Amino acid sequence: MKFWLLLGLLLLHEALEDVAGQHSPKNKRPKEQGENRIKPTNKKAKPKIPKVKDRDSTDSTAKSQSIMMQAMGNGRFQRPAATVSLLAGQTLELRCKGSKVEWSYPAYLDTFKDSRLTVKQSERYGQLTLVNSTAADTGEFSCWEQLCNGYICRRDEAKTGSTYIFFTEKGELFVPSPSYFDVVYLNPDRQAVVPCRVTAPSAKVTLHREFPAKEIPANGTDIVYDMKRGFVYLQPHSDHQGVVYCKAEAGGKSQISVKYQLLYVEVPSGPPSTTILASSNKVRGGDDISVLCTVLGEPDVEVEFRWLFPGQKDERPVTIQDTWRLIHRGLGHTTRISQSVIIVEDFETIDAGYYICTAQNLRGQTTVATTVEFS
């Protein structure tokens, strides 16, 4: 009996040990709070570098890529460089990719509606063709695609192209000027340009004063030379005024440009500075009266006048005259005086009241008024 009791206890003990062994592996201690549960390893892991898609770099390149192509002959096209030299007489053909392309080219071609220039638009590209080119055609040619939403269009800055083209012509180192003498106004608040542009990028160009005769250095501080614009006065002042000309040298030949009169402007930029004055503010019946509106401004800024007067609603006949002239006010300072005068003959009671003058330029407008009474 004791034997069977001992045997049963022994079997029960072994069964309990087997169950405990399944839940508590040997040599494993309980983890403390905060202990890292990731098994340490001596292997060095290589950091993973995220792959950059090639498409991204391709897209950024495409965005800045010019849409302009130049015809090279035999059906070949290539993207033009920033500057291109052609011989006068050659045909220029440019194409810009896009279904709605706009163009910009030297104003000389647009001013005279030159028949040598044609611009066409096809389904996939715009085309500009210039035949029988001359030195006067030298300048910037650019294009851009239009983005339109209904009737509202804007320039797509990601799809543009431009090139500056020199048309070299024998005996013409300078881009021809329509006159033999030109005026350049020196404004203290903006750059001034003496437009000595050349037809060959290799030409050496210098600036000269007529009297006293001397070369004016383009030192990069006050004056710089830009072959696409000419001599640029960065900060014009009264000492720069006078008559100047340019001299170009290339291929053992030299040429003198037209002369330029540099005039210093003393009137600051802004809306018109306007005054109004009546010949008399009290007028008897049957007399004549005039009201003068005067503007002092920059020499190269045009002014437009508009009048409101008492007899206007009754269609009272009046005479209006607009004039302008340049005046020199000491130390070479130059001002443009623009005037408008309204003349009323045989003054009547309907002519009494306010005479209102509005003067307008590109920078704004000014309105002034005066009263005229019947006496």
From Swiss-Prot:
Pfam families: Ig_3, VEGFR-1-like_Ig-like. Disulfide bonds join C96-C143, C293-C357. Gene3D superfamilies: Immunoglobulins. GO terms for cellular component: extracellular region. It is found in: Secreted. InterPro entries: Ig-like_dom (IPR007110), Ig-like_dom_sf (IPR036179), Ig-like_fold (IPR013783), Ig_sub (IPR003599), PDGFRL (IPR042495). PANTHER family: PLATELET-DERIVED GROWTH FACTOR RECEPTOR LIKE (PTHR15360), PLATELET-DERIVED GROWTH FACTOR RECEPTOR-LIKE PROTEIN (PTHR15360:SF1). Forms a complex composed of PDGFRL, TNK2 and GRB2. This is Platelet-derived growth factor receptor-like protein.
